[in-house]
Amino acid sequence: RVVIINTASIAAFDGQMGQVAYSATKGGIVGMTLPMARDLSSVGIRCNTIAPGVMATPLLLSAPQQVQDGIVSGIPFPKRLGEPSEFGQLVVHMVENSYLNGETVRLDGAVRMQPR
């Protein structure tokens, strides 16, 4: 079985000021997910996208603690950064769930980014 899993970002939905190009590219990934799933369905290929929020990556973890705390304060629940293992768990679920196709799933603790 073949499954394509793209990575977008919540910036596709909540782009901040100064992120025009980044938000547009991530929006493009979201926008191509359903048509791609439809186009590839005839050959048995599924396509989904994950739009992660603020994840505990090496780049973010290298930021000052005050910056990290400020970011976490805007995440409703759970009030923490997302873990890479949680991203991996969602990938596994998308691969194993054969009825999940053409979808974009936000993995973001219900955060909505502010304009700045």
Q: Over which residues does each language-model region extend?
A:
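Cytosolic ligand/metal-binding cores
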Residues: 20
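Alpha-helical segment proximal to the catalytic Tyr-Lys
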Residues: 38-42
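Residue(s) in the substrate-gating loop at a strand-loop-helix junction
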Residues: 9
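Active-site helix of classical SDR
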Residues: 25, 33
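Conserved catalytic-site region of short-chain dehydrogenase/reductase
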Residues: 12-14, 113
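C-terminal substrate-recognition "lid" of short-chain dehydrogenase/reductases
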Residues: 83-107, 112
